[in-house]
Structure formats: C-alpha cells, structure tokens
Amino acid sequence: TLDEFVGVVSVIREAGIRVDITMNSTCDGGDWYAEETLNRQIGFIRDMHEQHGIETVTLANPFLIEQARQTCPNLEISASVLADIDCFSRAEAFALAGATTMTVDTSLNRDLKLLRQIREKLGVELKLMVNEGCLNKCPFRKFHMNLISHKSHEERDEGNAFSFACGDIIGRDAGQIFKSNWICAATRASQASSKLSAAI
C-alpha cells in the first residue's frame, strides 16, 4: 500500500540514506500518455518529493522526464539505463528534457572518450551499470523489458521465457558471456601483480 511505501521511505531517510524512486517502465500500455495517467504519475513524483523528501527519481521516458522537471525543478532526475542512451545526440536529448544524471547504455561502458564528452559538454553526472546481465546487443532485450514493464502492474512474475531464449544463445556460444558489457574492476592485488610482471 502507499502508506507502507511511505513508511519504508521514512525509515530509509532516517538512516541518512538518499531515496531514488525507480519508475523506468519501457511501456505502460495504450493509456500511457492519457492525461489521467500522466497526472497520476507526475502527481505521485511531486508528492513523494515535496511531502516525503524523495531526492531522486529514475525514469526511462524522456516525455515523463520533461513533465517531472517542469513540476519539480529542484528534483534530481536520472535517465535510466533503459533509456538506451548510446550516443551523444541521445544523451543531449535527455539532458534537454531535464535529466541531471544518466545511466548510459552499457555499450558505452568502455568508451571513455564518449563518456568524457557527454559529461563535460552536457554537465551531467554519469553512472555505469557494471554488472550487466544481458548479452551484448541481445535481440530479446527490448521485448523482455516491455514484458517486465507490463508484468509490474500485475501480481504474477514474468516467467522464464526470456531466460530460456538467452540461455539458448549462450548454449550455442558460451563466449557470448565474455562479450557482455560488464566492467571488471581491478583489485589492488591484481594491479600490484601487473606492475610486478611489467617490471620483470
């Protein structure tokens, strides 16, 4: 219930932790842009921000970002990784809509030049998803995310159809796992080992 949700938010904030509401659906059906739906979604964001101190909201739809920015000028708005921000022009569009933070598409995780360009020219904070679980350029990803978006309105889970789909690809070529866009963080031990090897 809403009261339970607000209660959880209060506990988190009392612990000194910032709260980020994630509303990054990639599809909300045919009524997504209906006035009633928009008023409900933006009204919820406004109430959570103004009455309950929510600091951040994460959205995937640039139209919702624009509406949220107009309603809550001081709210931190983060563009979700599901916004598929995979180039400068797309990042610019989301910045103009009102996003101040972006989790870029995982295809940019290792493109340091473009990441720097986006950050410096648009003045936004960038976040990277380091534990990407999807295959690189997965043909099922868009449809999987749409299914999850629709299922989020129901009390049933999404099932495992897409897990099997991805599993079939990996079963045919296990190397696809290593082609995914996860980031491997070097530990101090491995860095020291590399320096030692270089010295030798």
Each model region followed by its residue ranges:
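Active-site pocket-lining/capping segments in soluble small-molecule metabolic enzymes
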Residues: 1-90, 103-200
